[in-house]
Amino acid sequence: MGGLQPWHWVIVIAVFVLLFGAKKLPDAARSLGKSMRIFKSEIKEMQAESKGDEPKPATPIASERVDTTAPEQQSTDRHTA
């Protein structure tokens, strides 16, 4: 139960033979094989490209830090008497 029995495969093959004819089946299988081969080669090519595009870890740049805070100003409130 749940799997295909041998007689299921016989029915599937018979349907293919009736639909496509015995002469067209080898050509259909050949073109399906070519399509699968092209598909696999494209997947391998995409994986090779994605491995080359991996981001490299960032390297810190050594730089001098400049103190940008203003010095504290002294109070200019002078009392004149």
Swiss-Prot record:
The chain crosses the membrane at residues 1-21. One of its GO terms (molecular function) is protein transmembrane transporter activity. The keyword Lyase does not apply. This is Sec-independent protein translocase protein TatA. One of its GO terms (biological process) is protein transport by the Tat complex. Part of the twin-arginine translocation (Tat) system that transports large folded proteins containing a characteristic twin-arginine motif in their signal peptide across membranes. TatA could form the protein-conducting channel of the Tat system. Pfam families: TatA_B_E. Its main location: membrane. The Tat system comprises two distinct complexes: a TatABC complex, containing multiple copies of TatA, TatB and TatC subunits, and a separate TatA complex, containing only TatA subunits. Substrates initially bind to the TatABC complex, which probably triggers association of the separate TatA complex to form the active translocon. Belongs to the TatA/E family. GO terms for cellular component: TAT protein transport complex. It is a single-pass membrane protein. NCBIfam families: PRK00575.1, tatAE. The gene is tatA. Residues 46-56 have a biased composition (Basic and acidic residues). It is found in: Cell membrane. The keyword Protein transport applies. Keywords: Cell membrane, Membrane, Protein transport, Translocation, Transmembrane, Transmembrane helix, Transport. Disulfide bonds: none annotated. Residues 46-81 are annotated as: Disordered.
